[in-house]
Amino acid sequence: MPTIQQLVRKGRQAKTTKTKTPALKGSPQRRGVCTRVYTTTPKKPNSALRKVARVKLSSQIEVTAYIPGVGHNLQEHSIVLVRGGRVKDLPGVRYKIVRGSLDTQGVRNRKQARSRYGAKKEKS
């Protein structure tokens, strides 16, 4: 335990927190170009074919991003918007693609949680 005099001289050092999305370089989102669109399988208790894309960001870093929702129109050279947010059962996937922006279309026939998937309000 430091004395008062030691605290006056040096002060306390604030704990540094490591960022969970280093490729975004402090931005909320970043634009990128798809270099590869493919499916991969999740970790042990789960079983599926998860849609992911390898994306080269405007910060010149290449990351793996998850494509949320049912169905997508992405292919190589598609321009996408990438946000942070990991996928728990896909190791190494720490980013998600924003649906309904740039080249990514929103999910069709989506009724609930539409804003998350870039789906427009259906005309009744």
Curated annotation (Swiss-Prot):
Keyword RNA-binding listed? The answer is: yes
Mind listing the UniProt keywords for this protein, alphabetically?
Answer: Methylation, Ribonucleoprotein, Ribosomal protein, RNA-binding, rRNA-binding, tRNA-binding
Its BP terms in the Gene Ontology are: translation
* Feature: compositional bias, Basic residues: 9-18, 108-118
Q: Which PROSITE patterns match?
A: RIBOSOMAL_S12
Q: Which Pfam families match?
A: Ribosom_S12_S23
Regions that span the bilayer: none
- The UniProt annotation puts the region (Disordered) at 1-32, 105-124
User: Where 3-methylthioaspartic acid occurs, residue numbers?
Assistant: D89
Annotated PANTHER family: 30S RIBOSOMAL PROTEIN S12 FAMILY MEMBER
Give the family from UniProt: Belongs to the universal ribosomal protein uS12 family.
Instruction: Outline the subunit composition.
Output: Part of the 30S ribosomal subunit. Contacts proteins S8 and S17. May interact with IF1 in the 30S initiation complex.
Q: What is this protein called?
A: Small ribosomal subunit protein uS12
* Source organism of this protein record: Salinispora tropica (strain ATCC BAA-916 / DSM 44818 / JCM 13857 / NBRC 105044 / CNB-440)
Q: Which gene encodes it?
A: rpsL
